[in-house]
């Protein structure tokens, strides 16, 4: 009977151990003096109807960063020197086709990809808090000038320049980092816990985003997080310049993602997401004028972000 009770206690103990897991505080804690690497790629397909005709345009944009941690202050805020070490820009559509990958075509730059090629070796400094907040961005003017010096005349308003803005403007760099590091919860979380955040992201059209994340599991020092987001255009955002035109966006959609974060450093090992947006683009003369043209549009985007403390030996899928 005693041995039976011991077996029961062992079973109960194993059951309890299997059903509970310690909560963790997920924070970005990069080590001063160390170097990390980031690469991200977005594959986007747009279906739009222009003057009664259907058009399909596909964009593929990618970038890689060497992230050197210059210093970490007493509050844990990290100042990084980010240097572009990889660039990708591909576009296919009715007007033009461009195919550039610096990893596969070193020294060979097709027309329409000059701006992305000019990123290589250029960079900026950025300060991030342990909660992933962007505190400061510096060196952007020098970055812009270095890229501008490599560009041919007449590229303003081209698809390449529009796609390049998040990588060479202070607002774009800040917004891209904000969207990348927005995931950290305010408090400790355990498996099954969820948290939410609302933010406005202006990488391209200004979007209001409501996100909910849930910690699925803790395994081998890695936190696996599932995310869902809903998004819609900010109706108060000013029109965007598009060459000779101005455009306003009326879009809405959703995003689903899975993120893996290293518990020890808070490094985002990977994020894979699928996003769908649909709605209309309004071509306008002034912010308050009625649309001169309305373009129905649907956008499907697959995106991947990876970070590591060493360079990858394989290409990003």
Where are these regions (language model features)?
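Signature of exported/secreted
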Residues: 23-317
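Positively charged n-region of N-terminal signal peptides that target proteins for export
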Residues: 1-6
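Bacterial N-terminal signal peptides
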Residues: 7-18
């Amino acid at each position: 009977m005693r041995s039976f009770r011991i077996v029961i206690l062992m079973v109960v103990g194993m059951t309890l151990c299997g059903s509970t897991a310690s909560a963790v505080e997920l924070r970005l804690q990069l080590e001063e003096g160390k170097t990390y690497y980031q690469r991200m790629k977005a594959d986007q397909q747009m279906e739009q109807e222009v003057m009664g005709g259907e058009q399909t345009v596909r964009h593929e944009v990618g970038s890689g960063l060497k992230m050197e941690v210059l210093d970490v202050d007493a509050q844990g805020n990290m100042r990084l020197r980010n240097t572009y070490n990889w660039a990708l820009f591909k576009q296919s559509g009715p007007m033009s086709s461009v195919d550039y990958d610096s990893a596969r075509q070193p020294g060979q730059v097709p027309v329409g990809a000059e701006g992305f090629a000019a990123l290589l070796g250029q960079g900026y400094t950025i300060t991030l808090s342990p909660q992933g907040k962007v505190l400061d961005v510096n060196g952007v003017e020098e970055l812009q000038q270095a890229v501008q010096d490599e560009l041919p005349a007449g590229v303003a308003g081209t698809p390449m320049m529009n796609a390049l803005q998040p990588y060479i403007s202070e607002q774009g760099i800040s917004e891209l980092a904000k969207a990348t590091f927005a995931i950290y919860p305010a408090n400790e979380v355990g498996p099954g816990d969820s948290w939410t955040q609302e933010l406005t992201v202006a990488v391209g059209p200004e979007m209001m985003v409501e996100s909910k994340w849930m910690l699925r599991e803790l395994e081998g020092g890695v936190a696996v997080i599932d995310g869902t987001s809903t998004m819609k255009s900010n109706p108060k955002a000013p029109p965007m310049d598009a060459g000779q035109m101005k455009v306003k966006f009326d879009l809405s959609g959703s995003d689903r993602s899975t993120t893996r974060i290293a518990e020890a450093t808070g490094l985002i090992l990977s994020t894979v997401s699928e996003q769908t947006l649909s709605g209309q683009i309004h071509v306008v003369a002034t912010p308050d004028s009625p649309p001169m043209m309305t373009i129905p549009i649907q956008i499907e985007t697959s995106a991947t972000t990876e970070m590591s403390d060493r360079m990858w030996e394989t290409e990003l899928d």
